[in-house]
């Protein structure tokens, strides 16, 4: 089954070579680049060239790149110097997307108001919303130049105020929605209703499961997420790429923290991910 998996299913820093090889051996032919998804790391040309060689060697097609809102460099920072640095960081990932010939999107986190935020925090996040609009305005010409898209992701506990506004304000041919099933399912603030409303804007997916208690990134059909509902939504959506699964072996029964070599655990985890992911892909095709 032609489905994709994230590169950081065990760790999101250091060399991904082992994880690319194991994913390929498990039958995956597509990946989402997810290393350094929450750092200020800038990929230099020698690193991108090395990644390109690995992808060719392991017969892997890059689908999406998970961008980063950074630590100090942040595309929605209210401090202008940090925001501009965040735009440069985003451009780095956009160029990486094109250099590695990805056929998907650049996935980015927007600012979000969480259900537990007080008034002062909400005021700050709304200012961050204005910052991210300035960043998107600066990035749109590059998206046009490279014929690329940014997918804005629904985030845990977010109330959708900013995400829905951005999707309403920006053109669908450049700015879309990355649907994250695990974030949708967290019971503190489920996202089922809003996700269905914006199904026509889905251009990327992060598929994983949990029990509703937190962002566990477990294999499909191991938690409480409503996969039958999602199959129906995706059938009616604008999404056309192969399904992408964003998983974490460390939060599954396959992981043994006492082990010094996790290779066999990862092989079992990936085999299970392939079986469960393919099962859901068949549901979407039925």
Regions found by a protein language model. Give the residues of each.
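Charged helix-capping and loop-helix junction motifs
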Residues: 44-50, 83, 87-90, 125-133, ...
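A short acidic, helix-capping loop that chelates divalent metal ions and anchors anionic groups
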Residues: 37, 71-77, 114-122, 186-187, ...
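Glycine-rich, proline-tolerant flexible connector loops at the mouths of alpha/beta enzymes
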Residues: 32-56, 109-113
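Histidine-acidic metal/acid-base catalytic patches
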Residues: 1-3, 13-27, 137, 145, ...
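Active-site acidic/histidine proton-transfer and metal-coordination neighborhood
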Residues: 17, 54-57, 75-176, 264-269, ...
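Active-site beta-loop-alpha junctions enriched in small/polar residues
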Residues: 6-10, 34-38, 67-70, 110-113, ...
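N-terminal-biased segments
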Residues: 1-16, 45-51
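Hydrophobic faces of well-ordered beta-strands that scaffold small-molecule active sites
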Residues: 3-7, 31-33, 62-67, 104-108, ...
């Amino acid at each position: 089954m032609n489905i994709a998996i994230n590169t950081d299913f065990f760790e999101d820093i250091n060399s991904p070579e082992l994880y690319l090889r194991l994913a390929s051996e498990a039958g995956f032919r597509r990946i989402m680049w997810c290393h350094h998804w929450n750092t200020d790391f800038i990929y230099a040309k020698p690193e991108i060239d090395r990644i390109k060689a690995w992808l060719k060697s392991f017969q892997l097609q890059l689908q999406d790149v998970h961008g980063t809102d950074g630590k100090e460099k942040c595309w929605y920072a209210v401090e202008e110097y940090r925001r501009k640095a965040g735009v440069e960081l985003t451009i780095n990932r956009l160029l990486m997307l094109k250099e590695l010939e990805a056929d998907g999107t650049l996935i980015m986190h927007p600012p979000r108001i969480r259900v537990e935020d007080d008034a002062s925090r909400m005021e700050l996040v709304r200012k961050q919303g204005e910052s991210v609009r300035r960043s998107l305005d600066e990035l749109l010409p590059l998206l046009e130049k490279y014929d690329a898209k940014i997918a804005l992701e629904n985030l845990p506990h977010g109330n959708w105020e900013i995400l829905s506004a951005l999707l309403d304000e920006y053109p669908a041919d450049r700015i879309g929605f990355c649907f994250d099933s695990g974030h949708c399912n967290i019971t503190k603030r489920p996202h089922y209703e809003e996700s269905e409303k914006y199904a026509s804007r889905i251009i990327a997916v992060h598929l994983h499961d949990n029990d509703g208690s937190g962002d566990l990134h477990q294999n499909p059909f191991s938690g409480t997420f409503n996969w039958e509902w999602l199959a129906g939504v995706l059938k009616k959506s604008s999404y056309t790429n192969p399904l992408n699964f964003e998983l974490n072996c460390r939060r599954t029964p396959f992981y043994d923290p006492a082990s010094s070599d996790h290779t066999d655990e990862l092989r079992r985890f990936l085999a299970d991910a392939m079986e469960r992911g393919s099962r859901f892909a068949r549901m979407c095709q039925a």
